[in-house]
């Protein structure tokens, strides 16, 4: 399966608490390899809050996922909070992506 990885931190405090972008990417890559997936793209967003969708890298990833055909089949994230803090907003994007047969998978 073709997958995209999305890693994000909002603060340097998070980076110091074992949620650094390199740590997230390492875990995401290991998960993808262990599950036989091919990583097509890595999206990295340092210093961006997940309280809204005004994140340039996030928007590029969504745009790539909505291409016909989609650039990848799955967006892999470390935890749901890396994608969105708000469950309603998460659901909106999850449904939007599902219409183009793209899933969001959290490894934790």
Language model regions located:
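Short, structured surface patches at the beginning of a domain
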Residues: 1-108
């Amino acid at each position: 399966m073709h997958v995209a990885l999305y890693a994000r931190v909002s603060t340097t405090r998070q980076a110091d608490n074992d949620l650094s972008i390199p740590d997230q990417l390492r875990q995401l890559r290991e998960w993808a390899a262990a599950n036989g997936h091919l990583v097509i793209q890595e999206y990295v967003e340092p210093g961006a809050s997940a309280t809204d969708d005004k994140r340039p890298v996030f928007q590029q990833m969504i745009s790539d996922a909505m291409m016909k055909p989609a650039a990848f089949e799955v967006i892999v994230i470390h935890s749901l909070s890396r994608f969105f803090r708000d469950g309603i907003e998460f659901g909106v994007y999850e449904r939007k992506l599902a219409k183009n047969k793209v899933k969001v998978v959290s490894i934790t």
